[in-house]
From Swiss-Prot:
Changing G95R: In THPH5; the activated protein cofactor activity is inhibited by C4BPB with a dose dependency similar to that of wild-type PROS1. GO terms for biological process: blood coagulation; fibrinolysis; positive regulation of phosphatidylinositol 3-kinase/protein kinase B signal transduction. Changing R515C: In THPH5; secretion of the mutant markedly decreased compared with that of the wild-type; intracellular degradation and impaired secretion of the mutant. The lineage of its organism: Eukaryota, Metazoa, Chordata, Craniata, Vertebrata. Its main location: secreted. This is Vitamin K-dependent protein S.
Length: 676
């Protein structure tokens, strides 16, 4: 036997240091000596020249690290083997380290434990999920990976879904990576084809025809939609289309009217607003043709009131006084009362009026009653000086200081009482209902102006002060012939449109001569008793700059639009249209046209039904009807003359008229001067 050298002694010392003292089992001296010696084999010298054998060197005998190297002939394997070899020795040497041995249950004996040490694949270093095989090497190992795995130990899964050479793993929609593999899947609403990669859309509308209820089912990629007409919203619970109340969403700037499937915005035209181009917001109706609205308080406007007296004066003078009146007068009106004078007890009166454009005088007292009309026509829009003077035996009427009439009278016009002559004078109207007392009835309304008045030879003292305080009594400085609608009121007429001699039953033939000052407003409207507007002619600003459109409407539907007319000019525009239950014809400066289409016939049927009942005719705007009754509700602003069924309408003959509407005088167009 040979005794192991210092290496083995050092080894045992190391072993003793590794284990705690409490776990060591000490041997007797004899047993310890047996561990440190081994028997030499025969031919030991010859064996030392051969490559070591693991079985011979380290199992049948104990080996130190140098002897272990003779087995492996390289340091890496030796360094790997020897520490594990010592562990096997501690576990399986008879009587040694029983505590350590008890903890080792992988190998049944020393031979198995030692033989397993050089195998780098035991214990398995490869990832069990990812490896296919493990190949032992010199102090190394090689793991062969399954498809879908990579890494030295096959520990990393390959993400096939992110392979640049096979985009999205070849999946048409969803690529799901899994450990060592992947699979394709489809989004909701798609099914996988047999190739397990491509997806096909599911047509839910065909599979379930009633899936949308009363709505329309529209298949879309991966899903379906239940469609409703514009203005409706789909209700999932009832599976039906419900109207959207857009008005509850504050869609309109002023007034909103909701109806099934839509809504319409309206602006208060009577307050000077119109609907903007966006059909939602409101904007001020702008002036397109400025007019000269300058007035003077020295000019008394006789048509301030549609019904009633403009100015009332009372005189108490000495009994020697006689009636006299001097004034300048201007009008385009042909008929109306200039002034009416009477005694305190109403028994005697004098009327100075205009009839047929000429001065007319009617008088009545205890002695006589007379009527005289004469002189030149003075409703020419020029200022004419008029004087009426009671003389001793007659009444003298002069125009421009030239006598035109002398009316004989047997006595004084007004009888003095108690030494005083008391007389009441009324301008442009009667104080009460005196029509029955007149010698010849007359329409008292007169659109005209007077200035430089001198009544009862008392001058104008006290009268100017009264007029100066009231703007609506002031007359325009310059006027032209025509009717003026200021954009703040309407005039109403009762017109019978029935024509028993015509097969059509009724007809509305209208001629308009207009010179608008603003580009939006209702010019003419027929209104039924139920506050509907079966027919209207309106003006609106066009989308084209500096032009206007004419709208013909039945109720709130536009049946025809005449586009892009230049109406806001200093020249009047002439428009004609004729409508009956079957036809609509119109004439403008640009064309004459007969309108015919299927929808028009339906609308004319609506108009025909209304015309068989009672309708009222309005000029310049609408009465109090709902905003939704017509496309336009703003008042017309400008000059306009109207002829209906061959009759020229006189605003003095209207059933009612706003006081601001001027029946026979239209403001002139504003002309800029160099200094303005």
């Amino acid at each position: 036997m040979r005794v192991l050298g210092g290496r083995c002694g050092a080894l045992l010392a190391c072993l003793l240091l590794v284990l705690p003292v409490s776990e060591a089992n000490f041997l007797s001296k004899q047993q310890a000596s047996q561990v440190l010696v081994r028997k030499r084999r025969a031919n030991s010298l010859l064996e030392e020249t051969k490559q070591g054998n693991l079985e011979r060197e380290c199992i049948e005998e104990l080996c130190n690290k140098e002897e272990a190297r003779e087995v492996f002939e390289n340091d890496p394997e030796t360094d790997y083997f020897y520490p594990k070899y010592l562990v096997c020795l501690r576990s399986f040497q008879t009587g040694l380290f029983t505590a350590a041995r008890q903890s080792t249950n992988a190998y049944p004996d020393l031979r198995s434990c030692v033989n397993a040490i050089p195998d780098q694949c035991s214990p398995l270093p490869c990832n069990e999920d990812g490896y296919m095989s493990c190949k032992d090497g010199k102090a190394s190992f090689t793991c062969t990976c399954k498809p879908g795995w990579q890494g030295e130990k096959c520990e990393f899964d390959i993400n096939e879904c992110k392979d640049p050479s096979n985009i999205n793993g070849g999946c048409s929609q969803i690529c799901d990576n899994t450990p060592g593999s992947y699979h394709c899947s489809c989004k909701n609403g798609f099914v996988m084809l047999s190739n397990k990669k491509d997806c096909k859309d599911v047509d839910e509308c065909s599979l379930k025809p009633s899936i949308c209820g009363t709505a329309v089912c529209k298949n879309i990629p991966g899903d379906f939609e239940c469609e409703c007409p514009e203005g409706y919203r789909y209700n999932l619970k009832s599976k039906s289309c419900e109207d959207i109340d857009e008005c509850s969403e504050n869609m309109c700037a002023q007034l909103c009217v909701n109806y099934p499937g839509g809504y319409t915005c309206y602006c208060d035209g009577k307050k000077g607003f119109k609907l903007a181009q966006d059909q939602k917001s409101c904007e001020v109706v702008s002036v397109c043709l400025p007019l000269n609205l300058d007035t003077k308080y020295e000019l008394l406007y006789l048509a301030e009131q549609f019904a009633g007296v403009v100015l009332y004066l009372k005189f108490r003078l000495p009994e020697i006084s006689r009636f006299s009146a001097e004034f300048d007068f201007r009008t385009y009106d042909s008929e109306g009362v200039i002034l009416y004078a009477e005694s305190i007890d109403h028994s005697a009166w004098l009327l100075i009026a205009l009839r047929g454009g000429k001065i007319e005088v009617q008088l009545k007292n205890e002695h006589t009653s007379k009527i005289t009309t004469g002189g030149d026509v003075i409703n020419n829009g020029l200022w004419n000086m008029v004087s009426v003077e009671e003389l001793e035996h007659s009444i003298s009427i002069k125009i421009a200081k030239e006598a035109v009439m002398d009316i004989n009278k047997p006595g004084p016009l007004f009888k003095p009482e108690n030494g005083l002559l008391e007389t009441k004078v009324y301008f442009a109207g009667f104080p009460r209902k005196v029509e029955s007392e007149l010698i010849k009835p007359i329409n008292p309304r007169l659109d005209g102006c007077i200035r430089s008045w001198n009544l009862m030879k008392q001058g104008a003292s006290g009268i100017k002060e009264i007029i100066q305080e009231k703007q609506n009594k002031h007359c325009l400085v310059t006027v032209e012939k025509g009717s003026y609608y200021p954009g703040s009121g309407i005039a109403q007429f009762h017109i019978d449109y029935n024509n028993v001699s015509s097969a059509e039953g009724w007809h509305v033939n209208v001629t308009l001569n207009i010179r608008p000052s603003t580009g939006t407003g209702v010019m003419l409207a027929l209104v039924s008793g139920n506050n509907t507007v079966p027919f209207a002619v309106s003006l609106v600003d066009s989308t084209s700059e500096k032009s206007q459109d004419i709208l013909l409407s039945v109720e709130n539907t536009v049946i025809y639009r005449i586009q892009a007319l230049s109406l806001c000019s200093d020249q009047q525009s002439h428009l004609e249209f004729r409508v009956n239950r079957n036809n609509l014809e119109l004439s403008t400066p640009l064309k004459i046209e007969t309108i015919s289409h299927e929808d028009l016939q339906r609308q004319l049927a609506v108009l025909d039904k209304a015309m068989k009942a009672k309708v009222a005719t309005y000029l310049g705007g609408l009465p109090d009807v709902p905003f939704s009754a017509t496309p336009v509700n703003a008042f017309y602003n400008g000059c306009m003359e109207v002829n209906i069924n061959g009759v020229q309408l006189d605003l003095d003959e209207a059933i009612s008229k706003h006081n601001d509407i001027r029946a026979h005088s239209c403001p002139s167009v504003w002309k800029k001067t160099k200094n303005s």
